[in-house]
């Protein structure tokens, strides 16, 4: 399958792998990466169903001269010996994941468990025919395989390809720390912009509040109040934009209405996912407060909202009207506890990074509010690049739960990957990028979202890590596409970085 794309003759001598390059021009690097990627697209590999692709990678890494371990989780750990003369160099890990998000355009018949991806190639892009492409992270794994074949001078290299990154990071979580502790550097290949080097990411934790409800009848007039027009967005990517949170906005409005007369809550819902800023929320109330007075209170709340969030969320508005179909109201103490909790929980940015003034360090998102006849549930999702900040938020949440009579379930904490103030690997890679791009500087950033590197950092805090990747667009959608022009530069960036590391001391 690969014969037309192999440009090295591998010779084995005393446990060493020696490479004799026949041709190493850019075109052949490109075709090798695409060939490796195309082989992956033929194997169905949705998260949780990685046996076939794991078995394939076990065989493939062995074919290029690696000693391969397949662990119980189906992670692949593949060790390539140092090139001759580079045995004293530190070990570098090249890391990616083998699973993908499988989605299809409406009307496209596609079984993610049995159908291969139909790879398409134009002059500019790699795409798929009607489905997601799986470039996240298939192209990263292909780059790893190519770099391990082409780099002539290198220290010991270990490829780690994990399972289930897209759903639960269970591969990274269950990876034996021994595979990380004998390495000095780790290059994660799961980013989506060749020009950006990521050097830190946020940890997070699921905080789930709940409280049982009692119900009673009420004869007061019933109304519907809703918040609409907010932009919402991903709570990692957009939390720093200063956007409003519909659930908290409506809770504050109900709190203001309580000052004008009796309010009885029938229902209160909002949000769709804990990691999404909720753009809408809705409540059904019964109240003795007159309609004109309610309209006035809501107008005041709109004014207050715009003074805080108007620049980022200019289209916010309240919708108000009579409610035709209502149920029984919840108890007064339960209503007070719920509104208190929703207004006490701090949403949005908590702290900015001390290393990068324009980057968020710590935030929290009040993502989902659900209510049925017998229970109310609140999903709260803090993130931070500093683990101790998450600990503080958890402690505060536990106190709020105690004060308001809510139960709190604290999920497994995803650790932060905290940016190093001095990174040898980032310095080397930045210099290589600049030399290969006419003196241009690589963008260096920490992201306010989770990466597998967070789990690696927790298991070996001494690991010097970066995350890079081939430029891609529309990941996790049928519009996903990979920029072909970025494939070779990415490979050469990795290869030259490995060559320079070969001259580092352990």
Language-model region placement:
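Active-site metal-coordination/substrate-binding segment of hydrolases
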Residues: 86-184, 219-222, 335, 343-353, ...
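A short beta-alpha structural unit
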Residues: 38, 42, 271-273, 283-284, ...
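Active-site-adjacent substrate-binding region
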Residues: 245-268, 419-463
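Acidic-enriched catalytic cores of C-N bond-cleaving enzymes acting on peptides and small amides
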Residues: 216-220, 239-269, 288-363, 397-399
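Zn-dependent metallopeptidase/amidohydrolase metal-coordination segment
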Residues: 33, 354, 361-377, 381, ...
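His/Asp/Glu-rich mid-to-C-terminal helical/loop segments that flank catalytic regions of hydrolases
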Residues: 178, 243-260, 289-290, 336-343, ...
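Acidic/His- and Gly-rich active-site-bordering loop/insert found
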Residues: 22-125
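Fold-level recognition of mixed alpha/beta catalytic cores in primary-metabolism enzymes, strongest
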Residues: 155-246, 254, 258
């Amino acid at each position: 399958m690969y014969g037309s794309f192999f440009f090295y003759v591998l010779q084995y001598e005393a446990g060493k792998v020696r490479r004799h390059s026949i041709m190493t021009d850019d075109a052949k690097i490109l075709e090798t990466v695409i060939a490796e990627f195309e082989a992956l697209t033929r194997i169905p590999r949705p998260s949780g169903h990685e046996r076939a692709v794991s078995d394939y990678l076990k065989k493939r890494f062995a074919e290029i001269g690696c000693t391969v371990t397949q662990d119980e989780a189906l992670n692949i750990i593949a060790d390539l010996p140092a090139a001759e003369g580079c045995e004293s160099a530190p070990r570098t890990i090249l890391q990616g994941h083998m699973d993908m998000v499988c989605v299809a355009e409406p009307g496209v018949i596609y079984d993610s468990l049995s159908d291969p991806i139909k790879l398409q190639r134009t002059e500019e892009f790699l795409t798929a025919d009607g489905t997601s492409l799986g470039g996240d992270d298939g192209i990263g794994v292909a780059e790893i395989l190519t770099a391990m074949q082409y780099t002539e001078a290198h220290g010991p290299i270990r490829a780690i390809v994990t399972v289930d990154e897209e759903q639960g990071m269970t591969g990274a979580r269950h990876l034996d720390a021994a595979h990380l502790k004998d390495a000095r550097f780790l290059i994660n290949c799961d980013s989506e912009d060749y020009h950006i080097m990521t050097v830190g990411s946020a940890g997070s934790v699921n905080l789930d509040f709940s409280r049982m409800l009692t119900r009673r009848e009420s004869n007061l007039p019933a109304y519907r109040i809703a918040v609409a027009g907010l932009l919402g967005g991903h709570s990692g990517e957009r939390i720093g934009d200063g956007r409003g949170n519909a659930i908290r906005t409506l809770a504050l409005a109900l709190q203001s209405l309580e000052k004008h007369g009796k309010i009885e809550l029938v229902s209160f819902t909002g949000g769709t996912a804990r990691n999404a800023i909720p753009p809408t929320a809705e409540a059904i109330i019964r109240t003795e407060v007159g309609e004109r007075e309610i309209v006035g209170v809501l107008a005041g709340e709109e004014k207050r909202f715009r003074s805080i969030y108007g620049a980022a969320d200019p289209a916010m508005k309240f919708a108000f009207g009579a409610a035709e179909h209502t149920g029984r109201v919840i108890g007064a103490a339960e209503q007070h506890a719920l509104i208190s909790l929703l207004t006490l929980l701090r949403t949005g940015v908590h702290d900015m990074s001390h290393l990068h003034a324009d980057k968020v360090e710590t935030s929290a998102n009040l993502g989902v509010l659900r209510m049925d006849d017998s229970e109310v549930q609140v999903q709260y999702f803090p993130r931070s690049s500093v683990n101790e900040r998450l600990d503080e938020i958890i402690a505060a949440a536990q106190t709020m739960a105690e004060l308001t009579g809510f139960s709190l379930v604290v999920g497994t904490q995803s650790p932060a990957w905290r940016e190093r103030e001095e990174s040898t690997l980032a310095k080397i890679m930045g210099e290589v990028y600049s030399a290969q791009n006419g003196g241009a500087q690589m963008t260096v950033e920490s992201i306010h979202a989770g990466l597998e590197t967070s789990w690696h950092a927790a298991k070996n805090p001494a690991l010097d890590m970066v995350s890079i990747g081939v430029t891609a667009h529309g990941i996790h959608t049928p519009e996903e596409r990979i920029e072909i022009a970025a494939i070779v530069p990415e490979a050469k960036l990795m290869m030259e970085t490995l060559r320079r590391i070969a001259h580092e001391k352990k």
